[in-house]
Amino acid sequence: MCGMIYHPTSRHVLTKATGYFDVPPVSARVMAKKAISVPGSKLYGPYTPGVMANGMIWLSGQIDVEAGGDTASQTAGALAKIDALLEAAGVTKDAVCFAQVLLDDIGDFQEMNEVYGAWVESMEIKPARAAFEAGALPAGAKVEIVVQAIDTNH
């Protein structure tokens, strides 16, 4: 235990160091989830393209196999879909704080990185990022990009 005792029916937490302090009710701490989507976007399964809750935005992995067969084209297409979803959420790419890039072949990293680099070029603070080879991706995609952003309007 972390030195705290919380009783689920009480509005107080007891700590060893400070005694009781008030905790807002759950309804005041948790906002409803809101779906984010772009009309006409193709989905590759039973999921929501994006979700907003508690000042955060989570976008599902974006792929664009229609953009072409090479990694650069698919990266540009996935990033364009991310831009559209962020716009639907009422923010810009500057709100992105983390990106995860999945590649079907890590040998295509540099090709993806050139397109991604151009996308983040204008950002004052570039998102934290992870990139790795995931093997086979949905619909034969070469690249899939997942992002998390801050709801700057919250």
What are these regions (language model features)?
Residues 5, 9, 14, 20-97, ...:
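N-terminal presequence-like segments and the immediate start of the first folded domain
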